Protein backbone atom coordinates (compact mmCIF):
# COMPACT_ATOMS: atom_id res chain seq x y z
CA UNK A 1 0.00 0.00 0.00
CA UNK A 2 1.66 3.22 -1.23
CA UNK A 3 1.07 5.99 1.31
CA UNK A 4 1.04 9.72 0.73
CA UNK A 5 3.04 12.00 3.00
CA UNK A 6 -0.20 13.10 4.67
CA UNK A 7 -1.20 9.48 5.34
CA UNK A 8 2.25 8.68 6.75
CA UNK A 9 1.97 11.69 9.04
CA UNK A 10 -1.45 10.55 10.24
CA UNK A 11 -0.16 7.03 10.98
CA UNK A 12 2.89 8.34 12.83
CA UNK A 13 0.57 9.92 15.42
CA UNK A 14 -1.11 6.60 16.28
CA UNK A 15 0.60 5.10 19.34
CA UNK A 16 0.16 1.51 18.24
CA UNK A 17 2.52 -1.49 18.17
CA UNK A 18 4.05 -1.90 14.69
CA UNK A 19 2.60 -5.29 13.69
CA UNK A 20 -0.91 -4.07 14.51
CA UNK A 21 -0.31 -0.71 12.86
CA UNK A 22 0.77 -2.40 9.61
CA UNK A 23 -2.19 -4.78 9.56
CA UNK A 24 -4.72 -2.10 10.53
CA UNK A 25 -3.41 0.64 8.22
CA UNK A 26 -6.47 0.58 5.90
CA UNK A 27 -8.75 1.12 8.90
CA UNK A 28 -6.49 3.70 10.54
CA UNK A 29 -6.74 5.79 7.36
CA UNK A 30 -10.51 5.28 7.00
CA UNK A 31 -13.31 7.83 7.59
CA UNK A 32 -14.32 5.83 10.70
CA UNK A 33 -10.97 6.62 12.31
CA UNK A 34 -11.13 10.28 11.26
CA UNK A 35 -14.57 10.55 12.85
CA UNK A 36 -13.41 8.79 16.02
CA UNK A 37 -10.35 11.02 16.29
CA UNK A 38 -12.56 14.12 15.93
CA UNK A 39 -14.96 12.83 18.58
CA UNK A 40 -12.17 12.20 21.12
CA UNK A 41 -10.65 15.61 20.39
CA UNK A 42 -14.03 17.28 21.01
CA UNK A 43 -14.40 15.39 24.30
CA UNK A 44 -11.00 16.67 25.46
CA UNK A 45 -11.84 20.21 24.33
CA UNK A 46 -15.00 19.99 26.44
CA UNK A 47 -12.73 18.98 29.37
CA UNK A 48 -14.43 15.61 29.78
CA UNK A 49 -12.50 13.02 31.78
CA UNK A 50 -11.88 9.98 29.61
CA UNK A 51 -10.82 6.50 30.75
CA UNK A 52 -8.39 4.88 30.36
CA UNK A 53 -5.64 7.54 30.23
CA UNK A 54 -4.64 8.27 26.61
CA UNK A 55 -1.34 6.36 26.87
CA UNK A 56 -3.25 3.21 27.85
CA UNK A 57 -6.03 3.30 25.24
CA UNK A 58 -4.24 0.78 22.99
CA UNK A 59 -2.69 -1.20 25.86
CA UNK A 60 -4.26 -4.49 24.78
CA UNK A 61 -2.68 -4.29 21.32
CA UNK A 62 0.59 -2.77 22.50
CA UNK A 63 1.24 -5.47 25.13
CA UNK A 64 0.11 -8.36 22.89
CA UNK A 65 1.51 -8.05 19.33
CA UNK A 66 -0.37 -9.68 16.47
CA UNK A 67 1.89 -12.73 16.14
CA UNK A 68 1.85 -13.35 19.92
CA UNK A 69 -1.94 -13.68 20.27
CA UNK A 70 -3.07 -17.09 21.54
CA UNK A 71 -6.35 -16.14 23.22
CA UNK A 72 -8.83 -13.27 22.92
CA UNK A 73 -11.12 -12.32 25.83
CA UNK A 74 -13.64 -9.87 24.45
CA UNK A 75 -15.15 -7.22 26.72
CA UNK A 76 -17.62 -4.42 26.06
CA UNK A 77 -16.27 -1.05 27.21
CA UNK A 78 -13.83 0.19 29.87
CA UNK A 79 -14.64 0.64 33.55
CA UNK A 80 -15.86 4.20 34.11
CA UNK A 81 -14.69 4.74 37.70
CA UNK A 82 -11.50 6.57 38.76
CA UNK A 83 -8.23 4.61 38.46
CA UNK A 84 -9.96 1.44 37.27
CA UNK A 85 -9.48 1.06 33.50
CA UNK A 86 -5.99 0.21 32.25
CA UNK A 87 -6.74 -0.60 28.61
CA UNK A 88 -7.22 -4.35 29.15
CA UNK A 89 -10.71 -5.88 29.22
CA UNK A 90 -11.90 -6.85 32.73
CA UNK A 91 -8.55 -5.71 34.22
CA UNK A 92 -8.05 -2.95 36.80
CA UNK A 93 -5.02 -1.12 38.14
CA UNK A 94 -3.28 -2.61 41.16
CA UNK A 95 -4.56 -1.21 44.44
CA UNK A 96 -8.12 -0.85 43.12
CA UNK A 97 -10.94 -2.99 44.55
CA UNK A 98 -11.87 -5.96 42.34
CA UNK A 99 -15.01 -5.25 40.30
CA UNK A 100 -17.76 -7.89 40.72
CA UNK A 101 -17.26 -9.36 37.21
CA UNK A 102 -13.56 -9.87 37.84
CA UNK A 103 -14.25 -11.46 41.24
CA UNK A 104 -16.50 -13.96 39.46
CA UNK A 105 -13.84 -14.61 36.79
CA UNK A 106 -11.28 -15.37 39.51
CA UNK A 107 -13.81 -17.61 41.30
CA UNK A 108 -14.39 -19.62 38.10
CA UNK A 109 -10.63 -19.82 37.47
CA UNK A 110 -10.12 -21.19 41.00
CA UNK A 111 -12.91 -23.76 40.59
CA UNK A 112 -11.70 -24.78 37.12
CA UNK A 113 -7.92 -25.01 37.62
CA UNK A 114 -7.37 -24.55 41.36
CA UNK A 115 -5.58 -21.25 40.76
CA UNK A 116 -5.49 -19.14 43.96
CA UNK A 117 -7.78 -16.10 43.83
CA UNK A 118 -5.64 -13.03 43.16
CA UNK A 119 -5.82 -10.08 45.55
CA UNK A 120 -5.26 -7.64 42.68
CA UNK A 121 -7.01 -7.31 39.32
CA UNK A 122 -4.16 -6.31 37.01
CA UNK A 123 -4.26 -8.85 34.16
CA UNK A 124 -1.07 -7.61 32.44
CA UNK A 125 0.61 -11.00 33.07
CA UNK A 126 -2.06 -12.69 30.95
CA UNK A 127 -1.61 -10.10 28.18
CA UNK A 128 2.17 -10.63 28.17
CA UNK A 129 1.61 -14.35 27.55
CA UNK A 130 -0.60 -13.79 24.51
CA UNK A 131 -4.08 -13.17 25.94
CA UNK A 132 -5.51 -10.23 23.99
CA UNK A 133 -7.80 -8.50 26.50
CA UNK A 134 -9.83 -6.51 24.01
CA UNK A 135 -12.80 -4.30 24.74
CA UNK A 136 -15.15 -3.60 21.84
CA UNK A 137 -15.06 0.12 22.72
CA UNK A 138 -11.70 1.42 23.96
CA UNK A 139 -12.70 4.62 25.78
CA UNK A 140 -15.47 5.89 28.05
CA UNK A 141 -16.40 9.15 29.76
CA UNK A 142 -15.96 9.12 33.55
CA UNK A 143 -19.14 7.99 35.28
CA UNK A 144 -20.99 7.48 31.97
CA UNK A 145 -21.09 3.78 31.00
CA UNK A 146 -21.37 3.05 27.25
CA UNK A 147 -20.93 6.80 26.50
CA UNK A 148 -18.41 6.20 23.69
CA UNK A 149 -20.35 3.52 21.86
CA UNK A 150 -21.22 4.06 18.18
CA UNK A 151 -18.37 6.53 17.59
CA UNK A 152 -16.17 4.21 15.51
CA UNK A 153 -14.53 1.98 18.10
CA UNK A 154 -16.77 -0.99 17.25
CA UNK A 155 -15.61 -0.87 13.64
CA UNK A 156 -11.98 -0.60 14.78
CA UNK A 157 -12.22 -3.69 16.98
CA UNK A 158 -14.12 -5.56 14.25
CA UNK A 159 -11.07 -4.86 12.07
CA UNK A 160 -8.80 -6.27 14.82
CA UNK A 161 -10.88 -9.47 14.94
CA UNK A 162 -10.86 -9.71 11.13
CA UNK A 163 -7.05 -9.43 11.06
CA UNK A 164 -6.73 -12.25 13.62
CA UNK A 165 -9.35 -14.31 11.82
CA UNK A 166 -7.59 -14.02 8.46
CA UNK A 167 -3.88 -13.89 9.34
CA UNK A 168 -3.69 -16.34 12.26
CA UNK A 169 -5.02 -19.79 13.18
CA UNK A 170 -5.71 -21.79 16.35
CA UNK A 171 -6.66 -18.79 18.48
CA UNK A 172 -9.13 -19.29 21.34
CA UNK A 173 -11.85 -16.63 21.44
CA UNK A 174 -13.61 -16.38 24.83
CA UNK A 175 -16.98 -14.67 24.41
CA UNK A 176 -18.91 -13.99 27.61
CA UNK A 177 -22.44 -12.65 27.19
CA UNK A 178 -24.68 -11.82 24.23
CA UNK A 179 -22.81 -8.64 23.24
CA UNK A 180 -19.46 -10.41 22.79
CA UNK A 181 -21.14 -13.38 21.12
CA UNK A 182 -22.80 -11.14 18.51
CA UNK A 183 -19.46 -9.48 17.79
CA UNK A 184 -17.84 -12.90 17.49
CA UNK A 185 -20.15 -14.12 14.75
CA UNK A 186 -17.50 -13.07 12.21
CA UNK A 187 -14.95 -15.60 13.56
CA UNK A 188 -14.11 -18.64 11.41
CA UNK A 189 -14.84 -21.62 13.66
CA UNK A 190 -12.91 -23.97 11.36
CA UNK A 191 -9.63 -22.12 12.05
CA UNK A 192 -10.21 -21.06 15.65
CA UNK A 193 -11.91 -22.24 18.85
CA UNK A 194 -14.82 -20.13 20.09
CA UNK A 195 -15.87 -20.63 23.73
CA UNK A 196 -19.10 -18.99 24.90
CA UNK A 197 -20.73 -18.57 28.30
CA UNK A 198 -22.92 -16.12 30.18
CA UNK A 199 -21.35 -12.81 31.19
CA UNK A 200 -19.49 -12.86 34.54
CA UNK A 201 -21.41 -9.85 35.90
CA UNK A 202 -23.38 -10.86 39.04
CA UNK A 203 -26.75 -10.27 37.37
CA UNK A 204 -25.95 -12.63 34.48
CA UNK A 205 -23.66 -15.11 36.26
CA UNK A 206 -26.12 -15.77 39.09
CA UNK A 207 -28.78 -16.72 36.54
CA UNK A 208 -26.54 -19.59 35.45
CA UNK A 209 -24.33 -20.27 32.45
CA UNK A 210 -21.09 -18.71 33.67
CA UNK A 211 -19.96 -20.67 36.74
CA UNK A 212 -18.76 -24.07 35.61
CA UNK A 213 -18.02 -22.95 32.03
CA UNK A 214 -14.38 -24.15 32.42
CA UNK A 215 -13.08 -21.83 29.70
CA UNK A 216 -9.60 -21.68 31.23
CA UNK A 217 -8.96 -25.43 31.17
CA UNK A 218 -10.62 -25.77 27.74
CA UNK A 219 -8.37 -23.00 26.42
CA UNK A 220 -5.17 -24.65 27.62
CA UNK A 221 -6.29 -28.06 26.38
CA UNK A 222 -6.86 -26.64 22.87
CA UNK A 223 -3.54 -24.77 22.84
CA UNK A 224 -1.64 -27.90 23.89
CA UNK A 225 -3.44 -29.96 21.22
CA UNK A 226 -2.05 -27.55 18.62
CA UNK A 227 1.50 -27.46 20.01
CA UNK A 228 1.08 -24.01 21.57
CA UNK A 229 2.42 -23.16 25.05
CA UNK A 230 -0.58 -22.96 27.44
CA UNK A 231 -1.36 -19.90 29.55
CA UNK A 232 -0.20 -19.68 33.16
CA UNK A 233 -3.35 -18.07 34.55
CA UNK A 234 -1.96 -17.52 38.07
CA UNK A 235 -1.28 -13.85 38.76
CA UNK A 236 1.60 -12.64 40.90
CA UNK A 237 0.79 -11.69 44.47
From Swiss-Prot:
InterPro entries (UniProt xref): UDG_fam1, Ura-DNA_Glyclase_AS, Uracil-DNA_glycosylase-like, Uracil-DNA_glycosylase-like_sf
One Gene Ontology term of the molecular function aspect: uracil DNA N-glycosylase activity
Cellular-component GO terms for this entry: cytoplasm
Compartmental location: Cytoplasm
Intrachain S-S bonds: none
SMART domains: UDG, UreE_C
Catalytic residues in the record: 77 (proton acceptor)
Keyword Hydrolase among record annotations: yes
BP GO annotations: base-excision repair, AP site formation via deaminated base removal
Keywords associated with the record: Cytoplasm, DNA damage, DNA repair, Hydrolase
Annotated HAMAP family: UDG
Annotated protein name in UniProt: Uracil-DNA glycosylase
